[in-house]
UniProtKB/Swiss-Prot annotation:
<comment type="subunit">
    <text>Homotetramer.</text>
</comment>
<dbReference type="GO" id="GO:0005737">
    <property type="term" value="C:cytoplasm"/>
</dbReference>
<protein>
    <recommendedName>
        <fullName>Methylthioribulose-1-phosphate dehydratase</fullName>
        <ecNumber>4.2.1.109</ecNumber>
    </recommendedName>
</protein>
<dbReference type="GO" id="GO:0019509">
    <property type="term" value="P:L-methionine salvage from methylthioadenosine"/>
</dbReference>
<dbReference type="GO" id="GO:0046570">
    <property type="term" value="F:methylthioribulose 1-phosphate dehydratase activity"/>
</dbReference>
<keyword id="KW-0456">Lyase</keyword>
<dbReference type="InterPro" id="IPR017714">
    <property type="entry name" value="MethylthioRu-1-P_deHdtase_MtnB"/>
</dbReference>
<feature type="binding site">
    <location>
        <position position="97"/>
    </location>
    <ligand>
        <name>Zn(2+)</name>
    </ligand>
</feature>
<dbReference type="Pfam" id="PF00596">
    <property type="entry name" value="Aldolase_II"/>
</dbReference>
<dbReference type="InterPro" id="IPR001303">
    <property type="entry name" value="Aldolase_II/adducin_N"/>
</dbReference>
<feature type="binding site">
    <location>
        <position position="99"/>
    </location>
    <ligand>
        <name>Zn(2+)</name>
    </ligand>
</feature>
<comment type="similarity">
    <text>Belongs to the aldolase class II family. MtnB subfamily.</text>
</comment>
<comment type="pathway">
    <text>Amino-acid biosynthesis; L-methionine biosynthesis via salvage pathway; L-methionine from S-methyl-5-thio-alpha-D-ribose 1-phosphate: step 2/6.</text>
</comment>
<comment type="function">
    <text>Catalyzes the dehydration of methylthioribulose-1-phosphate (MTRu-1-P) into 2,3-diketo-5-methylthiopentyl-1-phosphate (DK-MTP-1-P).</text>
</comment>
<keyword id="KW-0479">Metal-binding</keyword>
<keyword id="KW-0486">Methionine biosynthesis</keyword>
<keyword id="KW-0862">Zinc</keyword>
Amino acid sequence: MKQLFRQWYDLSEIKKELTTRNWFPATSGNISIKVSHEPLTFLITASGKDKTKTTPDDFLLVDHVGVPVLETELRPSAETILHTHIYNNTNAGCVLHVHTTDNNVITNLYSDAVTLQNQEIIKALDIWEEGATIHIPIIENHAHIPTLGENFRKHIKGDSGAVLIRNHGITVWGRDSFDAKKRLEAYEFLFQFHIKLLSIQGGVSNGANSYS
């Protein structure tokens, strides 16, 4: 029970911090944190809640397939399947899914992936080589959630990572809440920088094709 309360507090603090950045507009987004490994359980944001508010109903505990562990009237997000795929296939401890203007714009500039390079902040992703290049996959935003989940699952490669969904934000996961938040901050910085650079240069650079 102590672990549940500890993880609840941790997730609540993350929600508060991301809310101050306006990364949960119009009740969008969802975040989760692992509570136990065997059996797998995790806390996830309840569907349709105003994340600028802090209430006892912010999160609910679900199992390895996203079904509530305790009797509740709360519903987990429809995208809980993305979280279950991550937790069932990795040792990740936290998953963050947010909608920002920048990450949505990026998915309209590129088709299957966005490539970013030569930025010091890439080291926050535990990539240390000089002039490092990263590739972030972009998948289509299917209304059929099982199809979205299956396409998402193909890009889960390790205990940390990120996938962009076209016009539907980014999902980032990490070894724990600190790692996941750090990675999310790094990706959002990179997106913001890239978009500003393109606006100065006058268009999509480096031979990439606009997807819009």
